[in-house]
Amino acid sequence: MAGGVDGPIGIPFPDHSSDILSSLNEQRNNGLLCDVVILVEGQEFPTHRSVLAACSQYFKKLFTSGLVVDQQNVYEIDFVSADALSALLEFAYTATLTVSTSNVNDILNAAKLLEIPAVRDVCTDLLDRKILAKNDQMDLVDQIDQRNHLRAKEYLEFFQSNPVNGHQGSFPWTNPELRDLQRLNFRGQEDEEEPDCNGLDFYSQAPLNERPKANDCDPDSNPAMWLDREEEEAAAAPGSLFSPSQNGHYSGRGLGTPGEEEGAPGAALDQQDAGDSPSFVPTGAEAEDDARDVDGLAASVLQQVMGSVGRQQLGDDERKDDDGVVDYYLKYFGSSNESDVYPSWSQKVEKKIRAKAFQKCPICAKVIQGAGKLPRHIRTHTGEKPYECNICNVRFTRQDKLKVHMRKHTGEKPYLCQQCGAAFAHNYDLKNHMRVHTGLRPYQCDSCFKTFVRSDHLHRHLKKDGCNGIPSRRGRRPRVRDAGGLPTPTGNPEDGGFQGGGESQESEDTVQGNGREQHFEESSTAEAAGLNVAGGAAEGSAPGPS
């Protein structure tokens, strides 16, 4: 192919990453395709483990410990607050962190424990410059809760030191305080017997003599959900659990209510007796019917849980007060010190992640689409220009503008014409240049119908040439198809005289006659300026037609 390019061509899609992130956030809010639930202070946060692992090094180490079939679907952590985790999840899915004076300390501690350096640096900088922190809270900013730090460390070390997660009863606790805690994040305490079971507590795989009964449930703990491969084949047996890899379809013995279990048809043995008997194996028909009922029940229960959590989070977000956010922006951007206007963390590389979320400007109440666009809009009110050229010290409000500006110093011309090989520093220059090859002249004067390649040429034509509704006679010449048809100048060119008055009149008639035709633009700006000067001199020296 003539003029083509050999080899592969990379075609970028700038909005692809923001679309993916927006879709993941929509799935999280609706409880769709979430493969892990984080339980904090009784609140459930369904999310995607891949998103958490990409954002937090702590979750990455937690989720990658052990085999895939031995991973949990529910993790209960008590070393961070629910509000802090909610803010961090919003940051992971929307690239926007919402902080206020009331929760900045909790978010900072959670970011340190979960190893999220971006949030940690921002909160630390805000607290160091006293933008959000109060005077009576400064002594709490510089220290992390050591108890929560030990809990997070031991919680992670437990999964890393037990990759199979099959024998967790003899875990060597290094902290005696944690060993005596009533609420632990994993199976390290005695199970409290409770007659009623809601079917949402999952037990880890333990020896047969230590397994909880089918109607035992501990509401204050969230044990692990591991299963040996051998028991996956007999998942319908009492006391066993389905593999967590089966999309949340767990055994019906742990999901059914006592009333349903007593009245279940075809039950040959009592559930508790059957759970205590290792040799009990149901018949094929009973196991098939029981498994079918269990799958439907488990799927409906989990779907209701995910939906209720999503609706609860949406309702909480709608009821959230915006006063903290407004105070944050007003305090942050209202500072007169240069160190406050240009913080160090704001000069880092901005990620072009623009989640399609609607946010309202706290200053002018304008609704901004895109999570990453609100800080950029705020700079229009404050005049902040955090991005500075290290060569000429020119400042910019956006990083992409600084990147384009640097091409003036480096001479970089990344935009290449595939037809003639000409290189340009800006994309719009290449776009205008391509019209030379295509012949496209999209800008037309409404008065004289002259067409132009660029909009600034049309603007110059309207402003300087004085096109006021009739075809202009200054600074233009008629479109001539043959070189012999051009008028021959005579005498001094500065006088503007042409050979014979008839040819001059004929030239003017030609201009008026071709007023509605498309004319070729002058080859250069200097040539156009020369024509304007010559035309002005000719019109000024020669008397006009009577």
Swiss-Prot record:
It comes from the Eukaryota. Transmembrane segments: none annotated. GO terms for biological process: chromatin remodeling; negative regulation of DNA-templated transcription; negative regulation of transcription by RNA polymerase II; regulation of transcription by RNA polymerase II; regulation of transcription regulatory region DNA binding. Residues 34-101 form the BTB domain. Pfam families: BTB, zf-C2H2. Residues 189-288, 463-546 are annotated as: Disordered. Keywords: DNA-binding, Metal-binding, Nucleus, Repeat, Transcription, Transcription regulation, Zinc, Zinc-finger. It is found in: Nucleus. Residues 534-546 have a biased composition (Low complexity). A zinc finger (C2H2-type) spans 359-381, 387-409, 415-437, 443-467. SUPFAM superfamilies: beta-beta-alpha zinc fingers, POZ domain. Its main location: nucleus. Transcription factor that represses the transcription of a wide range of genes involved in cell proliferation and differentiation. Directly and specifically binds to the consensus sequence 5'-[GA][CA]GACCCCCCCCC-3' and represses transcription both by regulating the organization of chromatin and through the direct recruitment of transcription factors to gene regulatory regions. May also play a role, independently of its transcriptional activity, in double-strand break repair via classical non-homologous end joining/cNHEJ and in alternative splicing. This is Zinc finger and BTB domain-containing protein 7A. It comes from Gallus gallus (Chicken). The gene is ZBTB7A.
